[in-house]
């Protein structure tokens, strides 16, 4: 994540100094939020980004930063998106505020993202949809399976009353959380991922995606956060079952989202 009004991009400056071979960016290239006077820097516009012109202006502002320009010039990028490129905590065609015109907003946001990111022309948006998931090989050393767990996911389980989006829940209070048919990737992307992981021609399989895949609880009593994979446990189980069944070589999950660093072994449950 690189929220412009949180601070300056010193990290990009230092990374560019190290001359990386590749940059892998996993979510929230830009933020849709309205400008605030109490921030380090101020977002463009007079309100949250909602229209195509709004989103284009937001990317123009982010890309005016000299350090961000430099890191783009330093190395090729592999990247995916998450929610803030559109609207916080959206799920598929459903916005957090349940606004009836959300799909039009998503369409505008997707178009602006595609226009400003190093994506091939073949991925041009089709209506409100844009294919982001893809595979990239680094010789025979590693394969990046880049996922999109935002566009095709089911709605969050047990959202707060009167709105969409995530929360923390106890499993006992939210039977919907454990439904076997719930998906965070969509069935087509799940099949695509399993088929790619089954190939045995690289040493490392790097699953690059937006949100925490490791189980994440907020309390000792087991309150689960529903925006990450903990909110879609059946989908995570299917992926882990496939990794075991296919005997996938050296799987490693790379995750974005939480503005912290974790290194851990991911358990099935």
Regions flagged by a language model, labelled:
Residues 1-269:
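Metal-dependent phosphoester/phosphodiester hydrolase catalytic core
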